[in-house]
């Protein structure tokens, strides 16, 4: 078995404890589009998937309003994103891995600029070797981004572990 050299961290839901906040954001904006709100975490888990476009489709978002819903969601999410907590042991765990000599990277489906802003809110940008987000707000797959990064670093996939909270994170791993 190959020794682990690199940790790829998911951001939303893994280091950032934004599950309840994300549900609140959806429930705040969906009524304006005559779309159903969520009753809670269980319903969210039943519906959520990647890419997020499919999650939106499951919730009744048509192609005609997808862009409007995505932009409204992003604006509402950013409005109070400085109130979202990290998971209780997130910083300590990152530090423990750093002390063990592991490379660490945030690999997120979030838009790159917003991702950097969020990490900065918690003083975390400098704790990672790289922060890899997407070039758009549509939260598509991060698999290719991760693969390209590992290739550019020369780190074999077998020496990498992905830590996340979604089925997509398991697919990326």
Predicted features by range, described:
Residues 55, 96, 118, 171-172:
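Well-formed, non-transmembrane alpha-helical positions, independent of function
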Residues 3-92:
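N-terminal helical cap/lid subdomain that shapes the substrate entry/recognition surface
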Residues 83, 113-161, 167-171:
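Substrate-recognition "cap/lid" segment bordering the active-site pocket of phosphatases
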Residues 31-37, 62, 100, 123-127, ...:
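Short helix-capping segments at alpha-helix termini
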Residues 47, 88-89, 110, 137, ...:
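Short beta->alpha linker loops
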Residues 78-106, 112-116, 143:
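Short, acidic loop-to-helix structural element flanking the phosphoryl-transfer center
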């Amino acid at each position: 078995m190959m020794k682990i050299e690199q940790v790829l961290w998911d951001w939303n839901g893994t280091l950032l404890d934004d599950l309840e906040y994300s549900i609140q954001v959806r429930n705040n904006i969906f009524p304006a589009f005559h779309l159903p709100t969520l009753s809670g975490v269980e319903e969210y888990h039943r519906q959520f998937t990647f890419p997020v476009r499919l999650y939106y489709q499951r919730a009744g978002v048509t192609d005609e309003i997808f862009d409007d819903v995505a932009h409204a969601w992003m604006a509402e999410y950013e409005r109070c994103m400085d109130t979202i907590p990290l998971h209780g042991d997130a910083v300590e765990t990152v530090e423990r891995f750093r002390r063990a000599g592991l490379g660490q990277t945030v690999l997120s489906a979030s838009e790159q600029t917003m991702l950097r802003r969020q990490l900065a809110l918690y003083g975390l940008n400098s704790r990672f070797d790289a922060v890899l987000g997407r070039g758009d707000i549509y939260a598509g797959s991060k698999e290719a981004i991760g693969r390209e990064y590992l290739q550019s670093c020369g780190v074999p996939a077998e020496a990498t572990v992905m830590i996340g909270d979604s089925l997509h994170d398991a697919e990326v791993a």
